[in-house]
């Protein structure tokens, strides 16, 4: 690739403060433009209206066309997830051939330090079915060429690359779904996009973990150190492993089965959407030195294969439990979070996610219905500490406090 071509492409991406500025514009329903007084009539003829008058110019606004509004919504979603680089505007193009004049217009280009997503957007005013044979085959036919271009742009990084076909108000035919599967292209309909938009509102940039777990399901995470000191035991007829792990590692392989239409193919699902307020309180608690000694419950999915556990040389005789090294799957979406999603995701934006260890109890290859039953058993049998006992315990804890405020709370001061 010519250096000039490379620089032109890189200059068409935004990051940092520039990304924030573009996001601000894309998040709005209207386009804005400042014009001279003599051009107002012409702009009004084209559907613009006066937004604000200044001494030397007029600020005009016009509602975005439907296709632009949809693309901007999708663009904004990935920006809010914390992806570092996105295309500056709708004129972004990538070569797909040795002839660099042959280029493909890209609706949305998304990148971070590990991932690149290329997104094609289609929207209709009202729900309908359409034939996307030509569009899908065009993307599929140029896919390898576009990947080659990306590798030439970033020769020092082995990116995970995924193509996404995002639609709104379209019903895809079986033939189109088959074409997407054949080319390895993922379909995001409006329900899927809405789910990730809601998730991002609650989780912020942490929602990216759930996204990556979905689109890269089963793919290897080569840099992950998956060896964990663990205890193997039996309980209720099930084999389980108890261990401590850095939240950062579990976040990479973890996945939460939220109950929503976007996860309908994974039914039965059982988790409610993570609450933003609760997540923030967990992170604040952790960042201020707090910790949760109770275990997060997960199910490790190895596609029916046995998990590798290297027993240590010295074991306690006559003990059912065994100590050793557990080898976790080095794959996205291989650990389903049954209980403790707030405790885990509370670490996602914390500086302690790589330096703290959280306790985990892991079952292996539980059926989805077994996960649901376990989730229900845990939540049905948990009881909050009664208020009377909580007040008594607080009094005991604060009795010897040297803090005047805490003394006043229990009437000691």
Enumerate the predicted regions with their spans.
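Short helix-terminating capping/connector loops at secondary-structure junctions
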Residues: 153-160, 290-292, 354-355
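Intrinsically disordered, low-complexity Ser/Thr/Pro/Gly-rich regulatory segments
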Residues: 1-222
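Short amphipathic alpha-helices and their capping/turn segments at secondary-structure boundaries
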Residues: 107-112, 282-286, 411
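N-terminal leader or domain-start segments enriched in small/polar residues
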Residues: 169-331, 362-365
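Amphipathic alpha-helical segments that form well-ordered structural scaffolds
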Residues: 73-80, 281, 285, 346
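Extended hydrophobic secondary-structure segments that form protein cores and membrane-embedded regions
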Residues: 161-169, 359-363, 413
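Short, flexible/disordered intra-domain loops and linkers
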Residues: 98-99, 127-137, 270, 306-313, ...
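Basic- and aromatic-enriched surface patches that contact anionic nucleotides/nucleic acids
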Residues: 292-304, 310-412
């Amino acid at each position: 690739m010519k250096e000039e071509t490379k620089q032109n492409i890189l200059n068409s991406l935004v990051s940092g403060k520039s990304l924030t500025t573009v996001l601000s514009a894309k998040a709005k329903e209207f386009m804005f433009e400042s014009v001279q007084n003599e051009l107002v009539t012409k702009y009004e003829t084209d559907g613009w209206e006066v937004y604000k008058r200044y001494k030397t110019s007029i600020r005009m606004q016009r509602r975005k066309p439907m296709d632009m509004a949809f693309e901007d919504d999708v663009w904004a979603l990935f920006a809010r997830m914390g992806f570092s680089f996105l295309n500056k505007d709708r004129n972004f193009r990538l070569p797909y051939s040795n002839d660099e004049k042959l280029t493909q217009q890209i609706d949305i280009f998304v990148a971070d330090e590990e991932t690149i997503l290329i997104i094609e957007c289609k929207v209709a005013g009202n729900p309908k079915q359409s034939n996307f044979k030509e569009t899908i085959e065009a993307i599929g036919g140029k896919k390898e060429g576009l990947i080659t271009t990306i590798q030439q742009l970033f020769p020092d990084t082995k990116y995970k690359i995924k193509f996404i076909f995002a639609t709104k108000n379209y019903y895809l035919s079986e033939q189109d779904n088959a074409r997407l599967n054949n080319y390895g292209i993922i379909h995001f309909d409006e329900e899927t996009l809405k789910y990730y938009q809601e998730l991002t509102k609650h989780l912020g940039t942490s929602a990216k973990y759930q996204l990556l777990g979905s689109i890269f399901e089963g793919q290897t995470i080569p840099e992950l150190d998956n060896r964990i000191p663990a205890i193997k035991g039996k309980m209720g007829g099930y084999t389980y492993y108890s261990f401590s792990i850095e939240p950062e590692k579990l976040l990479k392989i973890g996945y939460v089965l939220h109950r929503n239409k976007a996860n309908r193919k994974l039914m039965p699902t059982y988790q409610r959407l993570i609450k933003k307020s609760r997540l923030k309180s967990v992170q604040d608690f952790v960042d201020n030195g707090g910790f949760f000694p109770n275990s997060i419950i997960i199910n490790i999915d190895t596609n029916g294969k046995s998990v590798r556990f290297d027993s240590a040389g010295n074991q306690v005789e006559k003990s059912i439990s065994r100590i050793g090294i557990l080898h976790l799957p080095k794959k996205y979406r291989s650990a389903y979070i049954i209980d403790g999603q707030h405790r885990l995701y509370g670490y996602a934006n914390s500086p302690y996610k790589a330096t703290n260890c959280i306790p985990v109890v892991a079952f292996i290859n539980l059926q989805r219905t077994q996960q649901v039953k376990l989730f229900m058993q845990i939540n049905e049998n948990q009881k909050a500490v009664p208020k009377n006992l909580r007040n008594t315990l607080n009094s005991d804890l604060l009795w010897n406090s040297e803090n005047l405020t805490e003394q006043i709370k229990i009437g000691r001061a």
